């Protein structure tokens, strides 16, 4: 494979020295970019973008062409590709977000679920990864990703997104055996899916545990973290002559950083409710940290964005082990110029912390 021209993202995840703090944005290929909206219109809909490797490659590269400061590309896809490949029938309702034609509500439903083969059932994702990796030609590393078992389970049991997860939590407490079987099947599926992405060319992987923070402390350990640990222990950690770093991101997981840091990943993602300096003091000896600016800061003026970037960099302090990111995905209404101001500020203001 082509040598990497910019590997500071991978170096920071492994806490190796860097010249400036690397930066990327969750959902950096997204609706805030006019070029993305044009590609989506051309493709017809969101799933057509995801399922066509050429379109997925095109939109993955758009933010990199616009912002030379980006230190990583992330595969353009959706976390719900796995449940879709299990036969749940993913579709998108305008204004409603993702929905499933089938829901999982009984032990029999769960027992009937297949474990998808990443190459046969999710081949379009593997094709997208290899296409993007080829087109990147070593510019920056490519991040692969998946949803966590708990997060995927919530969509499968609720039939879509939910405010209170009442069906999923009822299953968890009424029928823990069924929930554990579902999570175990999902953990196996995620492990093979991420390993498929690594073999296809992903140079780091992130597990998005978007809804883990909605669990009680005890339930989080048993029904979310335990299954992410299982995945991490089964991942390919070296490929193509390089280590493949793993990032775990539990939104609203700041109370549990110590136990997440024991899961075996290289880095933890932080949402904006955490103080990154405090997080470093607690777990920085074990893992790198990624984050964690409030995405809505991007609605403020560029000077205010720059001030907030400076505050977060100062809070983390000197040395490597920090990948700058937002605390969640960039939102569709953000002005692309403000995103550019954010990215420039990270590189300009962080050099002093790496001397």
UniProtKB/Swiss-Prot annotation:
EC number: 4.1.1.37
Record keywords: Cytoplasm, Decarboxylase, Lyase, Porphyrin biosynthesis
A Gene Ontology term for the protein's cellular component: cytosol
Protein name in the entry: Uroporphyrinogen decarboxylase
Binding sites annotated in the UniProt record for substrate: 27-31, 78, 155, 210, 328
InterPro entries, A to Z: UROD/MetE-like_sf, Uroporphyrinogen_deCO2ase_HemE, Uroporphyrinogen_deCOase
Higher taxonomy: Bacteria, Pseudomonadati, Pseudomonadota, Gammaproteobacteria, Pseudomonadales
Substrates-to-products reaction catalysed: uroporphyrinogen III + 4 H(+) = coproporphyrinogen III + 4 CO2
Record-marked site positions (Transition state stabilizer): 78
GO biological process, any: protoporphyrinogen IX biosynthetic process from glutamate
Highest taxon of the lineage: Bacteria
Main location group: cytoplasm
Species for this entry: Pseudomonas fluorescens (strain Pf0-1)
Function: Catalyzes the decarboxylation of four acetate groups of uroporphyrinogen-III to yield coproporphyrinogen-III.
Single GO molecular function: uroporphyrinogen decarboxylase activity
Oligomeric and partner information: Homodimer.
Subcellular location(s) of the protein: Cytoplasm
Family recorded in the similarity comment: Belongs to the uroporphyrinogen decarboxylase family.
Biological pathway: Porphyrin-containing compound metabolism; protoporphyrin-IX biosynthesis; coproporphyrinogen-III from 5-aminolevulinate: step 4/4
Gene name linked to the record: hemE
């Amino acid at each position: 494979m082509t040598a990497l021209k910019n590997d500071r993202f991978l170096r920071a995840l492994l806490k190796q020295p860097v010249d400036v703090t690397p930066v990327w944005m969750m959902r950096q290929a997204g609706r805030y970019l006019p070029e993305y909206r044009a590609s989506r219109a051309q493709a017809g809909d969101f799933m057509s973008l995801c399922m066509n490797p050429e379109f997925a490659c095109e939109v993955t590269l758009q933010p990199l062409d616009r912002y030379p400061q980006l230190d990583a590309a992330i595969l353009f896809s959706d976390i719900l590709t796995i449940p879709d490949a299990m036969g749940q029938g993913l579709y998108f309702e305008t204004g409603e977000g993702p929905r499933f034609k089938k829901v999982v509500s009984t032990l029999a439903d769960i027992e009937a679920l297949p474990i998808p083969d990443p190459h046969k059932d999710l081949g379009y994702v593997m094709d997208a990864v290899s296409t993007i990796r080829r087109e990147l030609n070593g510019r920056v590393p490519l991040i692969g990703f998946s949803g966590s078992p708990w997060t995927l389970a919530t969509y499968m049991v609720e039939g879509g997104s939910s405010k209170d997860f009442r069906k999923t939590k009822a299953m968890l407490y009424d029928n823990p055996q069924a929930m554990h079987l579902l999570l175990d099947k999902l953990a196996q599926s995620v492990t093979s899916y991420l390993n498929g992405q690594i073999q296809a060319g992903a140079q780091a992987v992130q597990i998005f545990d978007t809804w883990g923070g909605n669990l009680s402390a005890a339930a989080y350990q048993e029904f979310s973290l335990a299954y992410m640990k299982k995945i991490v222990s089964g991942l390919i950690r070296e490929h193509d002559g390089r280590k493949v770093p793993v990032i775990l991101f539990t939104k609203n997981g700041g109370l549990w950083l110590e136990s997440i840091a024991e899961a075996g990943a290289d880095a933890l993602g932080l949402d904006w409710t955490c103080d990154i300096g405090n997080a470093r003091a607690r777990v920085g000896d074990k893992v790198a940290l990624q984050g964690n600016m409030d995405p809505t800061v991007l609605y403020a003026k560029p000077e205010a964005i720059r001030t907030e970037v400076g505050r977060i960099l100062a809070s983390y302090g000197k040395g490597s082990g920090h990948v700058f990111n937002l605390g969640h995905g960039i939102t569709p209404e953000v002005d692309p110029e403000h995103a550019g101001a954010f990215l420039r500020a990270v590189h300009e203001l962080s050099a002093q912390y790496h001397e």
